[in-house]
Curated annotation (Swiss-Prot):
<comment type="pathway">
    <text>Cofactor biosynthesis; pyrroloquinoline quinone biosynthesis.</text>
</comment>
<comment type="function">
    <text>Ring cyclization and eight-electron oxidation of 3a-(2-amino-2-carboxyethyl)-4,5-dioxo-4,5,6,7,8,9-hexahydroquinoline-7,9-dicarboxylic-acid to PQQ.</text>
</comment>
<keyword id="KW-0884">PQQ biosynthesis</keyword>
<dbReference type="GO" id="GO:0033732">
    <property type="term" value="F:pyrroloquinoline-quinone synthase activity"/>
</dbReference>
<dbReference type="InterPro" id="IPR004305">
    <property type="entry name" value="Thiaminase-2/PQQC"/>
</dbReference>
<keyword id="KW-0560">Oxidoreductase</keyword>
<dbReference type="InterPro" id="IPR011845">
    <property type="entry name" value="PqqC"/>
</dbReference>
<dbReference type="GO" id="GO:0006790">
    <property type="term" value="P:sulfur compound metabolic process"/>
</dbReference>
<dbReference type="InterPro" id="IPR016084">
    <property type="entry name" value="Haem_Oase-like_multi-hlx"/>
</dbReference>
<dbReference type="InterPro" id="IPR039068">
    <property type="entry name" value="PqqC-like"/>
</dbReference>
<dbReference type="Pfam" id="PF03070">
    <property type="entry name" value="TENA_THI-4"/>
</dbReference>
<protein>
    <recommendedName>
        <fullName>Pyrroloquinoline-quinone synthase</fullName>
        <ecNumber>1.3.3.11</ecNumber>
    </recommendedName>
</protein>
<comment type="similarity">
    <text>Belongs to the PqqC family.</text>
</comment>
<dbReference type="GO" id="GO:0018189">
    <property type="term" value="P:pyrroloquinoline quinone biosynthetic process"/>
</dbReference>
Amino acid sequence: MSRAAMDRAEFERALRDKGRYYHIHHPFHVAMYEGRASREQIQGWVANRFYYQVNIPLKDAAILANCPDREVRREWIQRILDHDGAPGEAGGIEAWLRLAEAVGLEREQVLSEERVLPGVRFAVDAYVNFARRASWQEAASSSLTELFAPQIHQSRLDSWPRHYPWIEAAGYEYFRSRLAQARRDVEHGLRITLEHYRTREAQERMLDILQFKLDVLWSMLDAMSMAYELERPPYHTVTRERVWHRGLAS
């Protein structure tokens, strides 16, 4: 006998309860928040997270391409503009590059993606490929880790200037801008999710989709922990060179 569907309030509570697995609790992020991260670890995180940032518009474009609802598209497209930039606005990707410069990285090196670890690349690529293959509703719902994003952005704004005075203040603009953007995006994504998943089976699938996205974010930090905390980057027993691939054209 199938279980009854959760009502909207119960379903939303179940979604929010997934926050216990958000990457704000990963030891690598905790170390950054508590001021225990080295300059090299901060730089490694910024360089690798850039790959996630530049792929978010591709994920959102896949959702738009699969969505026949014009009203949804008109609202969702703002996410692409937030990252790529609208006319006269730099956008989030440019803001991230300024963060990279603020922590002492060369813009060209970050853009080259030469420091992106294979584990990070695999995790991000899995997310983008999911958005391309899934229904637009499922892909849109996978973005609901944004439920927990304002807290993580605020934690960086609260702790990093105190612990890492060597980071130039101009680099924090990305985190400031995402505070409002993430809250707006949550409202839209949550509305789509609560309206679309009406059966218990569908709701359980959505919770698993959200767990998949949480797995993506956690796995990225696992790869960075291996490379920058344990000092075991890929092929460390063979070479100290970055011999790993930098993305293959499809």
